[in-house]
Amino acid sequence: TYSGINFKDALAATGKGKILRSSVLNGGIDFSGIVAGSDSARFSEGDEVLVCGCGLSETRDGGYAEFARVPVNCIVPLPDGLSLHDAMALGTAGFTAALAMIRLEENHQSPPHGPVVVTGATGGVGSIAIDMLAGKGFEVVAFTGKQDQHDYLRQLGASDFIDRASVEMGSKPLEQAQWGGAVDNVGGDTLAWLTRTVKPMGNIAAIGLAAGFKLETTVMPFILRGVSLLGVNSVVMPLEMRDRAWQRLGADLKP
């Protein structure tokens, strides 16, 4: 079996985040492996499968173990195009980025609408999102404080960069519209700034809160520009959407 090391795993291991809901749990919020036994007709011994979220390392033991037992509605068949290793190389970060892409597509985000800015660009979700967006023909702007990582981000597909420290975020209900859309891993003031600077009918996929969970904005971007704020939750997700995202990770969204 394989399992990744994710941001939430680090928070759980260091005790810096309220991740573990029980005092003794195996870590690992995702894993891939081979079915050793099943009470469900959906899976048989020997099937290759994967699991992301579903309370792993929060309310039940996670993937840092030789064996794991999980509800059948959390399990996704390994898609064609991915090995067990590939699946966890992408892991929760890839799954989350794929969900963000699907949400943007469903709300009619398209390359002609303008550049898409990705915050937290050098992180797992940000890096994979840049690759996916560029692969679909979007102009991608990387928002980062790590100037020494520009070459890396350019290789992924970013065509321009925003230095986090140099941004004047302003305080008006609406600022100059610059972005066709956004994938935000940061939250806080950065997400509020994005709501004020995304173009009319643009979308923001909100994924993370590395800079804080409070969002201080107004209704103006939503009612005057038609901006849509799209939440992305990789933990609680219908099985159909889980399977759909992983199928695409093995096909057109594969890095």
Predicted regions and their residues:
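Glycine-rich beta-strand-centered segment in the early N-terminal region that forms part
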Residues: 1-5, 14-56
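N-terminal Rossmann-like NAD(P) cofactor-binding module of classical short-chain dehydrogenase/reductase
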Residues: 50, 180-183, 205
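NAD(P)H dinucleotide-binding glycine-rich loop of Rossmann-like/cofactor-binding domains
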Residues: 51-117, 255
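Mid-domain Rossmann-like dinucleotide-binding core that forms the NAD(H)/NADP(H) cofactor-binding site
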Residues: 88-164
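Short amphipathic alpha-helix with an adjacent loop that forms part of the alpha/beta core around
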Residues: 167-178
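Glycine-rich phosphate-binding loop and adjacent beta-alpha segment
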Residues: 189-254
